[in-house]
From Swiss-Prot:
The protein's assembly and partners: Homotetramer; dimer of dimers.
Residues binding L-methionine, per UniProt: 56, 99, 250, 281
GO CC, alphabetical: cytoplasm
Protein's recorded name: S-adenosylmethionine synthase
Family: Belongs to the AdoMet synthase family.
Co-factor note (free text): Binds 2 divalent ions per subunit.
Enzyme class label: transferase
Phylogenetic placement of the source organism: Bacteria, Bacillati, Bacillota, Clostridia, Eubacteriales
CDD domains named in the record: S-AdoMet_synt (cd18079)
Species assigned in the record: Syntrophomonas wolfei subsp. wolfei (strain DSM 2245B / Goettingen)
The keyword Amino-acid biosynthesis is annotated on this UniProt entry: no
Location in or out of the cell: Cytoplasm
């Protein structure tokens, strides 16, 4: 088989787009904690000295959004005015309305039965919050069943944050990006060919020091040694300088890192972002559910790779279509896998929210370093508790 290269990138929590994502999800979490049935669609823009939060929020609780914005920025690490963006001094503007009544018509019905178990009729009565198509994916090339390029890129971005906050590399600042190229043969990862790390830093630190520290404490701390060889190329701050960064260097906007958030381009994406959206928005909840489904299919050994697409209509509970692609790696047919999905997974929006327990303040931590492939108990869509059942029903 011919060998191929595939590349994915990730960014740190201090990247301007990720600052915006985290603010949006911090607002969502604050509302979910006080009002689990609140409706939230919070969009954030950040730029030099300014944060603007806009969108639609319907809730019976009060959230101090400016205070929440500042505490989120402080947690990320923008705490000095000379960074061009500072938790204490930045301006915070808000422009928020209630959710459109026309949209609510398709979602609200039967939410008066929100306490206790909903019967099948009530589950059918709660429709999707919008039309659209969503994808889920899993691959057996890593232990967490994620594509290797995005998994390693996300882990390196997370490691950049760790070495900064723990003082291991004390001169780093919050912004940063990572990129990993993996060589494949017959869809099996062979080696890492190239690693790129760009890390914001104090102006008086030499390029040689930065390169040495990043290779030692970030790249080699994350990339498995067996995936690196004498021909692997490391690029550390290839422009030679990365002092101006974060919202001072570029404006940031919620929802602009959807490939970083998911599978690094290895799987398709329906186009809908996640952050700032409550779980009635199927852009988010259905994507989480499809990751859960795909991961269980791969964990069960039904396929080595699996991509699933579903589509919804606003106000309609059941998906309009389900498509499965195992890329020729399936142990049973894709049609048979679709039958197993319909038998074992309820893809109606209210059932997704129920089965993944999505009405909780769990979203801020998803907003940096990827929504998938994370080993955290609160990421319920990463469970593989259906794998044994799927394997048995498939006759494997």
């Amino acid at each position: 088989m011919a060998r191929t290269l595939f590349t994915s990138e990730s960014v740190t929590e201090g990247h301007p787009d990720k600052v915006a994502d985290q603010i949006s999800d911090a607002i969502l979490d604050a509302i979910m904690e006080l009002d689990p049935y609140g409706r939230v669609a919070a969009e954030t823009i950040v730029t030099t000295g300014l944060v603007l939060v806009a969108g639609e929020i319907t809730t019976n609780c009060y959230v101090d959004i400016p205070r929440l914005v500042r505490s989120t920025i402080e947690d990320i690490g923008y705490t000095r005015a000379k960074y061009g963006f500072d938790a204490e001094t930045c301006a915070v503007l808000t422009s928020l309305d209630e959710q459109s009544g026309d949209i609510a018509l398709g979602v609200d019905r039967a939410f008066e039965a929100k306490k206790g178990e909903m019967d099948d009729k009530e589950l059918d009565a709660i429709g999707a919050g919008d039309q659209g198509m969503m994808f889920g994916y899993a691959s057996n090339e890593t232990a967490v069943l994620m594509p290797m390029p995005i998994y390693l890129a996300s882990k390196m971005a997370e490691r950049l944050g760790e070495v900064r906050k723990e003082g291991i590399i004390p001169y780093l600042r919050p912004d940063g990006k990572t990129q990993v190229t993996v060589e494949y043969e017959d869809y099996k990862p062979l080696r890492v060919t190239t690693v790129v790390v760009s890390a914001q830093h104090h102006p008086e630190v030499s390029s040689a020091t930065i390169e040495k520290d990043i290779i030692e404490h970030v790249i080699k701390a994350v990339i498995p040694p067996e995936m690196i060889d004498a021909h692997t190329i490391f690029y550390v701050n290839p422009t030679g300088r990365f002092v101006i960064g974060g919202p001072q260097g570029d404006s940031g906007l919620t929802g602009r890192k959807i490939i970083v958030d998911t599978y690094g381009g290895m799987a398709r994406h329906g186009g809908g972002a996640f952050s700032g959206k409550d779980p009635t928005k199927v852009d988010r909840s259905a994507s989480y559910m499809l990751r859960y489904v795909a991961k269980n299919i791969v964990a069960a050994g039904l396929a080595e790779r699996c991509e699933i697409q579903v589509a919804y209509a606003i106000g309609v509970a059941n998906p309009l279509s389900i498509n499965v692609n195992t890329f020729g790696t399936g142990k049973i047919s894709d049609d048979k896998i679709i039958e197993l999905i319909k038998k074992n997974f309820d893809l109606r929006p209210a059932a997704i929210i129920r089965d993944l327990d999505l009405r909780r303040p769990i979203y801020r931590k998803t907003a940096a370093y990827g929504h998938f492939g994370r080993e955290d108990a609160e990421f319920t869509w990463e469970r593989t508790d259906k794998a044994d059942t799927l394997r048995e029903q498939a006759g494997l």
